[in-house]
Design a protein with these regions (language model features):
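Residues at alpha-helix boundaries and the short loops/turns that link adjacent helices
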Residues: 20-24, 36, 55
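Short, amphipathic alpha-helical "recognition" segments used to contact nucleic acids or chromatin
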Residues: 42-56
Length: 97
């Protein structure tokens, strides 16, 4: 975990997110706390990660999501060398299906 982001403010943000009970509450909270572009960028990264795990090419991902190759590369680096956060979320999402 990155010590630079481990602050009381970030802890409070995560506690707020964990208090949300459903998708509608997520929309309400995230529309208030994020700009539309910030929220769309986060959603785009999650979609890029999903496509990378499915072995989709950078070109196909860029065409499908509109993500730049720099964004795709950054997400790919997180998938390979990150904290396994994407993997944890995808695993839990698959169990819910």
């Amino acid at each position: 975990m990155n010590d630079k982001i481990k602050t009381e403010s970030v802890d409070n943000l995560f506690e707020a997110i964990l208090s949300l009970k459903n998708t509608e509450e997520c929309y309400m909270f995230f529309e208030d706390i994020c700009t539309i572009n910030e929220l769309l960028a986060i959603a785009q990264r999650l979609e890029v990660a999903k496509l990378l795990k499915e072995q989709t090419t950078y070109i196909e991902i860029s065409e499908e999501t509109g993500a730049s190759t720099a964004t795709i590369s950054r997400v790919n680096r997180s998938l390979k060398y990150g904290n396994d956060g994407y993997e944890m979320v995808f695993s839990r999402m698959n169990k819910q299906d």
